[in-house]
């Protein structure tokens, strides 16, 4: 984060921000704990399309950064899928729209399925649990993903309906990602500064988004009405 951006957002110089704010932010980063993985098992965490077994919707969100001058580092944050250098964070959202998992910063050249498999130890699930993801997760076990029209295959009406159902439900991940990205730290210009500081800001913003989603569920009311109560594994 450069001096101009710091003064624009916080009304203080870069040196003052690093001296007075960053130590507090680092301590807060170590203590913050508002993302609750077990909320996925809430008896109201159901959808009419997926009344049993499905607990999480998965996706990734990106955080834009300045292009590094050294390609030895820049090669990890430049991906042709995006028009800008960035880091990725994998997120999991309950069917009720609550943020239940967020990974650390991942290189943007990493494939979503590989990130999921590499972080399995951070989000253990029961053998009966199922997940919903987009076309980047078909190689992951226990995932429902869209059917692709590859090799000349023409989707049948049933397959088209299935894809529409998945997209309708999985769009809840995109809403949660929008709440995360609405933090003013990530608006406008790309992040400039040390990756270790970006990690702190991203983690605090992720936990803050989890709190905001829970507060919004109480007032003005749930954005996504839960169904139940009943167990996920009947």
Language model segments and positions:
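Short, well-ordered secondary-structure "scaffold" segments embedded in the functional core
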Residues: 2-234
């Amino acid at each position: 984060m450069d001096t101009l951006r710091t003064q624009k957002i916080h009304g203080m110089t870069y040196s003052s921000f690093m001296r007075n704010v960053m130590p507090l932010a680092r301590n807060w980063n170590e203590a913050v704990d508002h993302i609750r993985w077990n909320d996925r098992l809430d008896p109201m965490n159901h959808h009419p399309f997926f009344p049993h077994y499905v607990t999480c919707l998965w996706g990734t969100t990106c955080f834009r950064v300045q292009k590094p001058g050294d390609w030895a580092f820049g090669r990890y944050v430049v991906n042709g899928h995006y028009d800008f250098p960035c880091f990725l964070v994998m997120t999991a959202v309950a069917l009720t729209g609550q943020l239940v998992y967020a990974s650390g910063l991942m290189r943007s050249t990493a494939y979503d399925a590989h990130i999921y498999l590499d972080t399995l130890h951070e989000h253990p699930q029961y053998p009966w649990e199922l997940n919903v993801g987009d076309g980047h997760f078909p190689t992951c076990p226990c995932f429902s993903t869209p059917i692709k029209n590859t090799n000349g295959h023409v989707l049948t009406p049933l397959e088209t309906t299935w894809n529409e159902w998945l997209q309708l439900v999985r769009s809840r991940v995109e809403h949660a990602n929008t709440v995360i990205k609405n933090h003013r730290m990530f608006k406008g210009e790309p992040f400039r500064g040390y990756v270790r500081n970006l990690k702190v800001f991203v983690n605090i913003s992720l936990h803050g988004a989890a709190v905001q989603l829970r507060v919004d569920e109480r007032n003005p009311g749930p954005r996504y009405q839960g169904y139940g109560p009943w167990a996920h594994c009947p």
